[in-house]
Amino acid sequence: MIVGLIGKIIKKEPTQLNVNVNGVIYEVFVSLNCSSKIVSDDVKLEITHIIREDAQSLYGFLDSNEKKLFDTVIKINGVGPKVALAICSTFTPTSFAQIVSSNDVSMLKRVPGIGPKGASRILVELSGFIIDSNDETSGSSSALEAALALESLGFKKDLVSSVLKTCVNSNTSDLVKEALKKLQK
């Protein structure tokens, strides 16, 4: 599996790059957001390598949160790489997380290839989608552990994620205690 590429861009289109890595040229599909952030010919991309019976495709990302969004969305039944890339092109990971948390079907229907049923399915499947912030890596892992603990106690994902956003503690056990107090009200 190819998980990353470092090389020079020899051809750039809005959603596709040809990247020369030590004499081997790779075709990499990128979102419009990713493409607009590329200012130099030298590029370092995180890659999702998808192997199908009839093709192998590389999808590149400058941002690990965008890669996480893509990887999460393509796991949903009925959503392929093209629609996942369209989601990444239409929304930043942060704005997508806000759309999911607010259950905004109309915003999600703006993505080419997503209708009302598809938008509803995506929102149901991804309730509780959280992106990692670069400066709070340990805090986000504690929040994830706390969320899993609370869900195992029977609380719903969307309720848990909304309560955890209001919590101020940083370690897992304190987060769980604080969230339980808020959930009991």
From Swiss-Prot:
Transmembrane ranges, per UniProt, are none
Task: Give the highest taxon in the source lineage.
Answer: Bacteria
| Compartments (UniProt record) | Cytoplasm
Q: Write out the ranges of the annotated region (Flexible linker).
A: 134-137
- Renumbered residue ranges of the record's region Domain III: 138-185
Task: Provide the residue span(s) of the region labelled Domain I.
Answer: 1-62
Enumerate the InterPro entries for this protein. DNA_helicase_Holl-junc_RuvA_I, Hlx-hairpin-Hlx_DNA-bd_motif, NA-bd_OB-fold, RuvA, RuvA_2-like, RuvA_C
**GO molecular-function annotation terms?**
ATP binding; four-way junction DNA binding; four-way junction helicase activity
A Gene Ontology biological process annotation? DNA repair
Annotated stretches, region: Domain II? 63-134
Alphabetical keyword list: Cytoplasm, DNA damage, DNA recombination, DNA repair, DNA-binding
The UniProt entry, under Gene3D superfamilies, shows: 5' to 3' exonuclease, C-terminal subdomain (1.10.150.20), DNA helicase RuvA subunit, C-terminal domain (1.10.8.10), Nucleic acid-binding proteins (2.40.50.140)
Quick one: where is this thing mainly located?
A: cytoplasm
Identify the GO cellular component terms for this protein. cytoplasm; Holliday junction helicase complex; Holliday junction resolvase complex
Q: Which SUPFAM superfamilies has this protein been placed in?
A: Nucleic acid-binding proteins, RuvA domain 2-like
Subunit comment: Homotetramer. Forms an RuvA(8)-RuvB(12)-Holliday junction (HJ) complex. HJ DNA is sandwiched between 2 RuvA tetramers; dsDNA enters through RuvA and exits via RuvB. An RuvB hexamer assembles on each DNA strand where it exits the tetramer. Each RuvB hexamer is contacted by two RuvA subunits (via domain III) on 2 adjacent RuvB subunits; this complex drives branch migration. In the full resolvosome a probable DNA-RuvA(4)-RuvB(12)-RuvC(2) complex forms which resolves the HJ.
Q: Which family does it belong to?
A: Belongs to the RuvA family.
The record ties this protein, via HAMAP family, to: DNA_HJ_migration_RuvA
What UniProt notes about the protein's domains is: Has three domains with a flexible linker between the domains II and III and assumes an 'L' shape. Domain III is highly mobile and contacts RuvB.
Task: Relate the protein's function as given in its record.
Answer: The RuvA-RuvB-RuvC complex processes Holliday junction (HJ) DNA during genetic recombination and DNA repair, while the RuvA-RuvB complex plays an important role in the rescue of blocked DNA replication forks via replication fork reversal (RFR). RuvA specifically binds to HJ cruciform DNA, conferring on it an open structure. The RuvB hexamer acts as an ATP-dependent pump, pulling dsDNA into and through the RuvAB complex. HJ branch migration allows RuvC to scan DNA until it finds its consensus sequence, where it cleaves and resolves the cruciform DNA.
UniProt protein name: Holliday junction branch migration complex subunit RuvA
Highest lineage ranks of the organism?
Bacteria, Pseudomonadati, Campylobacterota, Epsilonproteobacteria, Campylobacterales
